Regions:
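Transmembrane alpha-helical interface segments in multi-pass membrane proteins
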Residues: 299, 320-366, 382, 386, ...
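Intracellular coupling helices
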Residues: 1-10, 305-346, 401-412
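Nucleotide-cofactor and metal-assisted catalytic machinery
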Residues: 40-290, 413
Length: 414
């Protein structure tokens, strides 16, 4: 009753107060929208970092090697070159294993090949539509170099020579596509026309199964892949992978020296570590997360300043009213609750509007998210708690200032 009696004696600038309050609510709404988007992208980025790429990138150096067809026109020349290159690199101090692959993981290298026959019969999903997989040509030790898990059978090795029956290793996705519910070992398949064999089809037998590898991005689904030996399926381009026990970049000069001895005209292209390939694959999500995060923090700061400014102005304008309330029996705690309550009302309005807007607009982000829903409840709850905490902190100084108003000074001014 004392608070109401004191408040009735004071006239306030209601129109100006409503305008200032509306601006703060708008700032809070914008902050909620940006914070929710940034929170979703952050959670998605964390989920991406947890994805198993199907290989171990640590300590692996990579570079591209393309042989000019004018000087390496025959398949046996390509076989001999990459066999010797593997041998020379593996002999270097600090190198554990080395191998080449036609299609490095996370490099967006895409080479699809049709599967024309399975176990002697047609390999069609329906008439006229052949199944297809990604083709990977590798040299021995590739799976060991990249630490790819062998799930069944054997890996491709030196016994898979030119002229011998074509040996094929498939990944889990290819196994499920081509022989669902069955063990693929020992099954035969015929690969479609390929430049690797001069346009001829290649029939082979499955000798091993490996785990899926994320070739097209950590957030992308793994695709069916078949692996064949370079000695049996010669190509003139491979990405070399080198597993090292020393810092990978420290071996670049030695590798370049070995290559110069083999062919001084061949360059060492795209020299990177697999850790760099992994980092590059999440560079875009990281950029979006940081950009939205910066704007969100700025919006949150402006909203906090807005709440502080509105409350500080209101306390100055209503100091006489507050003093009268105190003189009529209001406690300091009552005054603090009044000021903080005003802050919570402003924050609540902005929070409600912001969450409703976020619920509608964050669906636009769904294409950028991995492993998290665009309406993730934990993210929305976290943003609500953060905004409430910021509003509370922003109101503390004006609230304490209001609680220290001297009622005797206010009564003399009245």
């Amino acid at each position: 009753a004392a608070l109401k009696a004191g408040g009735a004696a004071v006239t306030v600038d209601r129109a100006g107060g409503r305008t200032r309050g509306a601006l703060v609510v708008a700032e809070m709404t914008f902050a909620v929208l940006l914070l929710t988007g940034a929170g979703l992208l952050l959670k998605s980025f964390v989920e991406l970092q947890r994805v198993d790429p199907g290989f171990n990138p640590r300590g692996v150096l990579t570079f591209d090697m393309a042989l000019p067809r004018a000087r390496y026109a025959k398949p046996e020349q390509s076989r001999a070159f990459f066999t010797e290159l593997d041998r020379r690199i593996e002999a270097l101090p600090g190198v554990e294993t080395a191998a080449g692959v036609f299609g490095l993981p996370l490099s967006d290298f895409n080479y699809s090949i049709s599967i024309e026959k399975l176990d002697g019969g047609p390999a069609y999903d329906h008439p006229g539509n052949a199944r297809s997989t990604q083709l990977r040509v590798i040299t021995p030790d590739y799976f060991r170099t990249m630490d790819v898990r062998l799930l069944d059978g054997r890996a491709l090795d030196e016994t898979d020579r030119a002229g011998a029956a074509l040996a094929v290793v498939v990944n889990e996705s290819a196994s499920k596509l081509l022989w669902p519910g069955d063990d693929p070992l020992g099954h035969s398949l015929e690969l479609g026309t390929s430049f690797g064999l001069g346009g001829a089809r290649a029939g082979g037998t499955v000798v091993g199964v490996v785990s899926d590898i994320k070739h097209f991005g950590l957030g992308e689904a793994s695709r069916p892949e078949v692996f064949v030996a370079h000695s049996q399926f010669p190509v003139d381009f491979l990405s070399m992978t080198v597993k090292t026990s020393v810092p990978p970049q420290s071996l670049v000069a030695a590798i370049r020296g070995q290559l110069r001895e083999m062919d001084s005209e061949l360059p060492l292209d795209q020299v990177r570590t697999m850790d760099e390939w992994v980092a590059a694959s999440v560079a875009q999500p990281r950029f979006y997360m940081l950009l939205l995060g910066i704007f969100a923090v700025a919006a949150l700061f402006l909203a906090a300043i807005g709440i502080y400014g509105v409350l500080a102005y209101a306390v100055r304008q209503r100091s006489n009213e507050i003093g009268i309330r105190r003189a009529l029996g209001a406690e300091a705690g009552d005054v603090v609750r009044m000021v903080v309550g005003r802050a919570m009302m402003l924050a609540g309005g902005g929070l409600l509007a912001g969450l409703l807007a976020s619920f509608a607009l964050t669906r636009i982000l769904s294409g950028l998210l991995y492993g998290v829903s665009a309406t993730d409840a934990l993210t929305f709850a976290g943003v609500a708690i953060l905004l409430a905490a910021v509003a509370l902190l922003a109101s503390l100084v004006p609230a304490r200032r209001a609680a220290r108003v001297d009622p005797m000074v206010a009564l003399r001014e009245e």
